[in-house]
Amino acid sequence: MVAKAYYFKGEYIEAKKTLDFIKNKYKKTEIAFESELWIAKCYIALEDYNFAESILDELRAKKRFPDKLNKELLLTFADLYIKQEVFSDALDELKSACNLIKRKSKKARYYYIIAQIYQDAGNSKQSKKYFELVLDANPEYDMVFNAKMNLARTLRTKKDLNQMKEKLLKMIKDEKNKDYLDQIYYTLGEMNIIEKDTTTAVENYSLSTKHSVENDIQKSLSFLQLGQIYYKKSEYPTSKIFYDSAYTFMPEIHQFYENTKETKEILEKLV
């Protein structure tokens, strides 16, 4: 469909024009309903959330709305709520969408989003549950890897932490993970922090920086963690070195950039 091509190129106004034409030409047909759904997506992309929600509400209320489009309607609602940061409603829509998907492998992506929402909310129990569902769905390796890294951060009991550390250490030896070593060592460092073992955390964060060749964001986060550890110890000269490095590698659009910059400037005055 030409309209979808416009949409995926980011040309939302052109996409909406085409979709409006289709909706009006083929009224009360399945393609008309689908066009309205994509018009709502365009409004979401344009950040006109109120108008997008009004379209979606109207579609949900229509008795003739095709069953085969229900999953996409739920996922579009979820996207809208995530953009608005109404995460409780987003979770409801995502879970309902998962109930309509039969193949586990197709559910993996949405389980992952659900897990991330719970993780960001600090709900380790539910986050752990959904990251485990991601792994159970046996998706592509990149998602498996990221789910394992995030799952490790949800663990709290000594038994769970030790079991996961064993798995991560095995992953380090696996050739297919050679490009992910920076993330594995970083995750080990995160687990060390949970255990209040800052000495080992420093070792793992340092290894993360050494193995981070092309991933500047990961490198910056590892340096940032090192900077924070030494800052809390009041070892300001050492902390400054790591904050300088974190600031150097961190892109300006990163959520931690401004805070990193401020702390770096404070350390410049202290040292």
Question: Where is each model-derived feature located?
Answer:
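Acidic, polar-rich low-complexity tracts and alpha-helical solenoid repeat scaffolds
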Residues: 1-271
